[in-house]
Structure formats: C-alpha cells, structure tokens
Amino acid sequence: SKKLSLFSDKTEIIPCGVNLNLFKPIDKLASRDKLGLDHNYNYVLFSSSFNNKIKNAALAKLALSNFENIILLEMKGYSREEVHLLMNAVDILIVTSHSETGPLVVKEALACNCPIISTDVGDVKELAKGVENCYIVDYDAKHIEQRIRDILSSNKKSDGRAAVKHFGLEKIATDVYSVYKRVLK
C-alpha cells in the first residue's frame, strides 16, 4: 500500500518463466500411450496433490461426481517431462484452489494448449482472457460440471500457447538481466 507506493518506481515484477521448448503441444494419444492411460476415458488433471487443503480437491471431486467416464488424476510425484505428457494427455486441467500466486501449472497447460477450468486465483483470469476453452469459474460444483461438459462436447484443445509466449525462459532471463543492469548503474 503506502510503503509499496513509495518504491513503485524502483519495483519490477518478473513472473516465473515457462520452458516453452518442453511445454508444447504434442499428440494426445501418443502422450496417453507413454503414460499408460486408457484411450476410452476422459481425463481431468487436478493441479496439485489431493492432500493440499488450499488446492480444494473436494470441489473438483464434487464437480466430477456425476460423470462415469472421467478419471481425475492427481499431479503428484511426476517429473517435468511427465507433467508435459500429462498436459497433452488430459482433456482438462482443473484448478479449484482457494489461493495461488501464479500459478505456473496454468502457464504450462496454456503452453500445451490444454483446456483449463480455474477459480479466480493468482493471475489466471488475466492469462486465460480470450483463450478458447479456458474458463474462470466460481466455487460452484454445478458451474464447474457444466464447463467440463462444454469442453468435452467441443472436443477442442485451447489456443493458449500464444497467451504465454512472453513467459518463455529466454524472455524472463532477459528481463532479469535488464533489471540487474539498471540496478548496477
């Protein structure tokens, strides 16, 4: 607030970058094969561990309770390469968190053109603005359920990669370097 406004001319916000060389769209069925996922199901990737209370897995599970052919996957214990495969193998990333900073997982999903359903946390609303098959939702299981149905019936990926191209690691490194140069002058 007041303290921050005193230093606003000396403040620079640099977001977390995304490895756009790794997180990119690849074939869904090939990704499922590599992960051992059945082609006969729809998959929704939960953004974190089910045990993390802030991430609100209960809401995601409730929203999916009326579906028989959907498997909710927990993003826990995967390498970065496996997360990339997951983003391409699943039909939807779901974020039902009570709070977030970024979240980086949304940027990675966008880079893979993975459809997203998210509560209004962190900078998700700004990131998803104008992106096809990316929805900001209330903490309402029925609303989330409807958005899941919308995405599955469209049978389309998102067009999110363009929304995160300025979060590439090279761009972020250049931004950090620029800040250091200004500070050292």
What are the language-model segments listed below?
Residues 1-10, 18, 22:
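A short, active-site helix/loop in glycosyltransferases that binds the activated sugar's phosphate group
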Residues 18, 38-55, 61-64:
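Conserved donor-binding/catalytic core segment of Leloir-type glycosyltransferases
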Residues 24-37, 158:
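A short helix/loop element that forms part of the nucleotide-sugar donor recognition site in Leloir-type
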Residues 85-90:
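Short alpha-helical donor nucleotide-sugar binding micro-motif in glycosyltransferases
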Residues 98:
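Aromatic "clamp/platform" in nucleotide-sugar-dependent glycosyltransferases that forms part
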Residues 115-118:
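Short hydrophobic beta-strand element within catalytic cores of glycosyltransferases
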Residues 130-142, 150-153:
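Conserved acidic donor-binding segment of nucleotide-sugar-dependent glycosyltransferases
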Residues 155-182:
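A charged, aromatic-enriched C-terminal amphipathic alpha-helix characteristic of glycosyltransferases
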